[in-house]
Structures are given as C-alpha cells and as structure tokens.
A protein has these predicted regions:
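Surface-exposed amphipathic alpha-helices with a cationic face
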Residues: 60, 126-130
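Active-site loop signature of alpha/beta-hydrolase-fold enzymes
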Residues: 76, 96, 114, 142-145
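A general structural motif
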Residues: 49-50, 130-132
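Conserved N-terminal segment of class I S-adenosyl-L-methionine
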Residues: 1-101, 105-109, 122, 179-181, ...
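A short alpha-helix capping/helix-coil boundary motif
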Residues: 58, 102-105, 132, 141-146
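Residues lining the SAM
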Residues: 109-112, 138
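S-adenosyl-L-methionine-dependent methyltransferase catalytic module, highlighting the catalytic core
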Residues: 3-9, 16-19, 27-34, 116-124, ...
Length: 248
C-alpha cells in the first residue's frame, strides 16, 4: 500500500493541485536551474540529450530553459517560462501532449505522487522516452510518514521503496543512482506553522515563502550525495532517482 490517504478521483486531485500551484506561482519569481543542487547532475547529462522534457516544473525548472519542452497544469508558471525563452504546453503527466520516443532526457520532480493513476503517469514517461533515455524524478517515501502536509499540497501517496522500484521496472526504468532529496523543513512544528499561515493568511504566507523562505532554502541547500543504485532509505523522507529507459 502506497498511502494511508483516502482515495480521491484524479480530476479532484488535478483541481486541488491547480488551485494550490496557480496561487503559488502567480507571485513567484523564476529560479534558474543552475542555482539548484541538481544542476551538476543535470549538466552531466546534457551533451548527449538534445531533446529534453520537464514535467511540472512550476517556476523551479531543473533543465535549461532554452531548448527544453515544458508541460505543466499551471498557466501562470508556463507564462513566466515562455518569457524566458521556454516552450511550454498545458497538460498533465497522465496524458503528455507528445509523440512516442521523442526525448533523450526527462525530468519529473515531485509530480508522480500527485496523481491518482501513477501507473499511467509512468507509462506516459516511458512512452515519450527513447530507449536509453535518462529520467530524473523524485518522490516522497514511507506511507507511515503521511501527514497533513501531504494532503495539503495535493499528494496522493508516499511510496514504499521496494514498491517504487517495482513500478519503475514495470515501465522500463532501471535506477542507476539516487540521493536523499527535498527542501521541506525537518521540524514538524515549523511545517504545521507554515500550513496554518497558508490556510489562514494565504496571500502573505505565499509572498513570504516565495520571497524569503525559498531563496534561503536554495542558498543553503546541500550538494546531492549521489550513490549507485538505491540508497539506504530508512531515514530518507524523499528520494531523487536517476533512471535509465531500458531497451526492452
């Protein structure tokens, strides 16, 4: 079982996610990919990857903005990406608006856990990836750690590591490297306080997050500690995975 949350239709989850993230991105500034701790990994994969796709980047893209295709449910985010030279299309990870085998490098950070039908999401990522393509993705782990924060930001599930590997393998993806990931504060009290302000003082809370908390998180983020295969996830709340699309 991937999540202790009650089942919700995909359409309801989509509406909840669109409402939350449109409000978030409307007041946000775009943060360049080079500023994230994922950039060294991304940069190492760019040379052989001329066709690139990032799913649900918001205003935190990890791939270079120019010459990358972006798909997102947020018109606000896509509009700002376009002003910086990005190519953006409204769409969902469960119905990617692209043909088969069209991309050499795909990023999908913090998105698979948001959809009801994650099997379809993974099938779509597999469909648009060429054989040998790299997929960088991240997901929250351990259903026992489910909290009000997960529900608030529109998560459908947290993953058991073994089940996650099985799901990826069924859709042709093998994990090459991984690392602990995420910028969520470790203090439950701080998370609860942030949620309270987002519920009761939404506009100023979003401004504070976008203009103060997020820039500070980016500035003080630690380098990714990548390891071969899947890391020991016992104490890891969220994991980044570099996967490779198998040829069969």
């Amino acid at each position: 079982m991937t999540s202790p949350s009650p089942g919700r239709p995909d359409s309801e989850l989509l509406d909840a996610n669109r409402h939350f993230y449109n409000a978030l991105w409307a007041d946000a500034r775009l943060i360049e990919p080079e500023r994230f701790n994922t950039w060294p990994l991304v940069h190492s994969l760019l040379a052989p990857a001329q066709r690139r796709l990032e799913v649900a980047p918001g205003l935190r893209p990890r791939l270079p903005i120019e010459d990358t295709q972006f798909v997102d449910i947020s018109a606000a985010a896509l509009g700002k990406l376009r002003t910086r030279g990005g190519s953006g299309t409204l769409g969902s990870i469960t119905a990617l608006p692209y043909g088969n085998a069209g991309f050499d490098l795909i990023c999908a950070f913090d998105v698979i856990e948001h959809v009801d039908d994650d099997e379809r999401a993974l099938a779509e990522l597999s469909r648009v990836a060429v054989y040998g393509a790299a997929l960088i993705t991240s997901v929250p782990l351990h259903p026992a750690q489910w909290s009000g924060f997960d529900a608030f930001v529109g998560h459908r599930r947290r993953y058991e590591p073994a089940e996650l590997l099985d799901k990826l393998a069924r859709h042709g993806f093998a994990v090459e490297r991984s690392a602990a990931f995420g910028m969520k504060p470790k203090s439950p009290r701080l998370v609860d306080l942030g949620m309270w302000f987002l519920i009761h003082q939404r506009a100023p809370a979003i401004r504070l997050y976008n203009r103060v908390m997020m820039p500070l998180s980016v500035r003080f983020q630690k380098p990714l500690a990548l390891a071969q295969g899947l890391i020991d996830t016992a104490e890891v709340a969220e994991v980044l995975l570099l996967c490779r699309r198998a040829s069969n």
